[in-house]
Design a protein with these regions (language model features):
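C-terminal motif of bacterial Sec signal peptides marking the signal peptidase cleavage site
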Residues: 14-17
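Positively charged n-region of N-terminal signal peptides that target proteins for export
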Residues: 1-4
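Sec-dependent N-terminal signal peptides
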Residues: 6-9
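Low-complexity, intrinsically disordered segments exposed to solvent
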Residues: 19-265
Length: 265
C-alpha cells in the first residue's frame, strides 16, 4: 500500500511539473503580445487612412464598395464624408471591411490648416471591430499631426486599447496630391495602450519610421525603416526594427538578447 501511495505521489509531482512547463510557454508568448498588438494596430490605422484618402479623391464617383456620401457642402462650416462598406464584408485592397468610416473636415486632405476628425460606426477590418477617434491635422503642406484617442480594436483574443500622438512629415509626393501611392512619410511620436492580455505598454519612436505608400501596390504593409522602443508593464524594453526586407510585413523585435521575427497577416 505504501508503494502505491509513493508511486501516486511521484505521478502527481510529474504531472505538476508538466503542467508548470505548459504554463511557462504561454507566458513567453505573452511577453511579445504588446509588440504584436501595437504592430497590428499600426497596420490597421494605415489601412484606414488609405480608405480615407481614397474617399477624398473619389467621393464624386459611384462605387458599390465602398459608397461615398458627402454632406453639408458648405464652405463656411465643416463637411462630412461617410465611407460606407455596407453591412456585409466587402473586399478593398485585400482587406475585408464592413461598416462606416465617418469623417468631419473643414478643408481637403492635404490643405494647410485642415482638420479631419474620424469616427466609426460598426466598422470592421478583417472582422476586427475598430472604435474611437482619430484626428489628422495638416499643419502645413508637408507636416501632419495625428491624434489617436480612446481607440479600441476588438479581436478574437481580446481588446487592444490605443492612445497617442504622431507627427508625420511628407518627404515625397507633395506635387501629386491625387496620387497617394508615391507618398513617403517620416513618422515620430509616442503611443500608449493596453494589449489584448490586459497588460499596459508605452511606445517611443526612437528612429523615425518610414511609411512608403508605394508598398500598397504589392503588400499590405508600408513600413520601410525605423525603430521604436516598446515598454510593456512589468517587462523589459523591446526594440522594434522595421524594414527587414523591403515591402513586406516582416518586423524584428529584439529583447533580452534575443531576436524574434513577427510577420503581420
Amino acid at each position: 500500500m505504501k508503494k502505491t501511495i509513493l508511486f501516486f505521489n511521484i505521478f502527481l509531482l510529474s504531472l505538476s511539473s508538466c503542467v508548470d512547463e505548459k504554463v511557462l510557454n504561454p507566458v513567453e508568448q505573452i511577453n511579445l503580445q504588446s509588440s504584436r498588438d501595437y504592430l497590428l494596430s499600426e497596420n490597421l490605422f494605415n489601412h484606414i487612412y488609405r480608405s480615407i484618402e481614397e474617399g477624398f479623391i473619389y467621393n464624386g464617383q459611384a462605387k458599390n464598395c465602398p459608397s461615398y456620401t458627402l454632406l453639408n457642402q458648405n464652405i463656411n462650416n465643416s463637411d462630412t464624408l461617410i465611407i460606407d462598406f455596407g453591412e456585409e464584408n466587402c473586399l478593398q485592397f485585400g482587406q475585408l471591411k464592413r461598416g462606416q468610416i465617418i469623417c468631419t473636415f473643414n478643408e481637403k486632405y492635404h490643405t494647410s490648416g485642415s482638420i479631419i476628425n474620424t469616427t466609426f460606426s460598426q466598422f470592421y477590418i478583417n472582422n476586427i471591430l475598430i472604435e474611437g477617434n482619430l484626428e489628422l491635422s495638416c499643419l502645413d503642406n508637408n507636416l501632419y499631426q495625428l491624434e489617436i484617442s480612446n481607440t479600441s480594436l476588438t479581436t478574437n483574443y481580446g481588446v487592444i486599447n490605443i492612445n497617442g500622438s504622431l507627427e508625420k512629415q511628407m518627404i515625397n509626393g507633395q506635387n501629386s496630391i491625387y496620387n497617394y501611392l508615391d507618398d513617403i512619410y517620416l513618422v515620430n511620436g509616442n503611443i500608449s495602450g493596453n494589449s489584448s492580455n490586459g497588460n499596459s505598454f508605452d511606445i517611443l519612436i526612437s528612429d523615425p519610421i518610414t511609411y512608403d505608400l508605394s508598398c500598397f501596390q504589392s503588400s499590405s504593409c508600408i513600413t520601410q525603416s525605423g525603430q521604436a522602443i516598446i515598454t510593456p508593464n512589468n517587462y523589459e524594453n523591446r526594440l522594434i526594427k522595421y524594414g527587414f526586407s523591403g515591402c513586406d510585413c516582416d518586423i524584428i523585435v529584439e529583447y533580452n538578447n534575443e531576436t524574434t521575427l513577427i510577420v503581420l497577416d
